[in-house]
Amino acid sequence: MIKIVNDQFTAVGAGTYTLKSTGALTIQFDLGDGEGYQTITDGVFTEAKTVLIALPSCDLKIISAGANKLTIA
């Protein structure tokens, strides 16, 4: 399990992940192709939430999270 906080990023390999937030936040990804971070479709959480999502190999980052955290498993 990986926990990230506001404006922190972590690299993930391609696969299916469970993402669990403790509250409102926005999840972004960067493929390393020079386009920079982009918001994941349905990656804007307005409350605590758990989702299952398939991701490519990328860097994940959360923004607009305040004190909220994201757990990746």
PLM regions: where:
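Acidic, Ser/Thr/Pro
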Residues: M1-A73
